[in-house]
């Protein structure tokens, strides 16, 4: 019988213990902290020309018996992080054998092959396992790692693949504007890959690493930017982190207050389109993966800055251009609706100039479409706020062209100073206005 004093078993004590256990679990579940992204990139299928250099792209496998060292630019201070690795586009399982994180060596930064002595932390998975076999199409998250990182600083992530990934279909982000290092053998803890072994190579791409999350206070939040090569940093300086989102981050950090607790997550890729797959999945489809499905309650803001590649690759005739303009506007409406359903403020950015000698995107019919779409972005009232990049960087005498001071040379992408002007065009008050996100719209 329950409650017998002779056995020492008490129903009352049993229930009290059970309630305490449940209470403890509930307190943990309701912690005021959250996991939130502090770095990210848009995973995509790596094109043949962007695979790692020989001998790391052999016919049967990529990265076979190879160490890969990559650096990323952190956007928020943190002391506990975890890493996500994507095999979304892999044609086979991705066998991660070992991994570490570290700080770059003193006096170095983005693109460095060297790490700071004593800063290395071993990365584990699923409760302490040293590696993970990531199924094709899947994503894996590491165990939490205690390491102090600062906003606008660099973190080094090193991976070792004993057998490599079979085939030539792998996941990565070619437009890293950051140098990565490769070496034969397991060198995840090596002080400097460039002097560790023969056969060391470098490439300006990222592979497999898709996000870094941090365990942050509830006040922390994030801006996700859905964009194309202009946001991905074409025309910026390799290893300098001077894309326009990087320079916007500098403004937020300098502003302090609540603004310094906003991460910026660059979910852009060169050649990306809203209405059709190209270099990476179309933005209308990937907004679920790249924004809505991201962790934490801090996903407060999203900025949509795409459309130039849809206009520029659509046929030149007026009927086709009328159609692509109409479809872009409808797609913006869909993206806004879906962001609002998640309580996320939806910001829109006007499409920047794309005309110039020999620039096919700047044909008159395409320019008409750009102007029409921009007027809708500015005047429809559908976006919660508008960032007028077009007005900020266009030539004051010929609004169809970039100001020559900001042009990287192709009449489409900007140089680092132009990206500074874009970053300055963002009114920081919009982040305070929508600090709690938005109400869920009917």
Predicted ranges, named:
Residues 27-226, 236-238, 257, 434-442:
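N-terminal secretory targeting modules
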Residues 220-245, 270-273:
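Catalytic nucleophile-elbow at a beta strand-turn-alpha helix junction centered on a G-D-S/GDSL motif
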Residues 257-275:
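Short connector loops at secondary-structure junctions
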Residues 269-327:
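Oxyanion-hole/transition-state-stabilizing segment in secreted/luminal serine hydrolases
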Residues 305-307, 315, 342, 347, ...:
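Extended, charge-rich intrinsically disordered regulatory tails
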């Amino acid at each position: 019988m329950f409650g017998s004093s002779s056995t020492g078993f008490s129903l009352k004590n049993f229930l009290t213990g059970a309630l305490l256990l449940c209470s403890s679990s509930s307190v943990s579940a309701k912690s005021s902290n959250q996991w939130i992204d502090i770095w990210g990139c848009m995973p995509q299928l790596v094109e043949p020309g962007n695979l790692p250099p020989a001998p790391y792209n052999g016919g049967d496998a990529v990265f076979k018996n190879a160490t890969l060292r990559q650096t990323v630019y952190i956007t928020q201070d943190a002391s506990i992080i975890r890493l996500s690795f994507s095999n979304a586009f892999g044609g086979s399982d991705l066998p991660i054998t070992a991994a570490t994180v570290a700080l770059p060596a003193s006096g170095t930064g983005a693109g460095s092959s060297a790490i700071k002595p004593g800063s290395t932390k071993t990365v584990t998975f699923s409760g302490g396992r040293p590696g993970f076999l990531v199924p094709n199409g899947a994503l894996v998250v590491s165990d939490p790692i205690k390491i102090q990182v600062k906003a606008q600083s660099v973190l080094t992530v090193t991976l070792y693949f004993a057998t490599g990934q079979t085939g030539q279909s792998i996941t990565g982000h070619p437009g890293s504007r950051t140098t990565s290092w490769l070496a034969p053998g397991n060198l995840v803890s090596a002080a400097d890959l460039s002097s560790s072994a023969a056969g060391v190579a470098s490439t300006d791409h990222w592979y497999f690493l898709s996000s870094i999350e941090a365990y942050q206070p509830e006040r922390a939040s994030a801006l996700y930017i859905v964009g194309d090569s202009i946001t991905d940093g074409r025309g910026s300086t390799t290893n300098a982190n001077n894309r326009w989102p990087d320079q916007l981050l500098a403004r937020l950090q300098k502003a302090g207050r609540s603004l310094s607790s906003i991460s910026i997550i660059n979910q852009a890729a060169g050649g990306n389109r809203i209405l059709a797959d190209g270099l990476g999945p179309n933005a209308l489809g990937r907004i679920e993966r790249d924004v809505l499905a991201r962790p934490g309650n801090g996903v407060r803001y999203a900025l949509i800055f795409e459309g130039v590649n849809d206009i520029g690759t659509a046929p030149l005739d007026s009927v086709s251009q009328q159609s692509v303009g109409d479809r872009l506007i409808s797609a913006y409406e869909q993206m806004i609706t879906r962001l609002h359903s998640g309580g996320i403020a939806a910001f829109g950015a006007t499409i920047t100039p794309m005309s110039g000698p020999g620039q096919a995107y700047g044909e008159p019919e395409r320019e008409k479409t750009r102007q029409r779409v921009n007027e809708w972005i500015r005047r429809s009232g559908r976006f919660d706020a508008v960032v007028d990049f077009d007005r900020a960087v266009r030539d004051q005498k010929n609004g169809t062209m970039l100001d020559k001071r900001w042009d990287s040379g192709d009449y489409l992408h900007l140089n680092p100073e132009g990206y500074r002007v874009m970053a300055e065009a963002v009114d920081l008050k919009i982040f305070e206005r929508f600090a709690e996100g938005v109400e869920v719209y009917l």
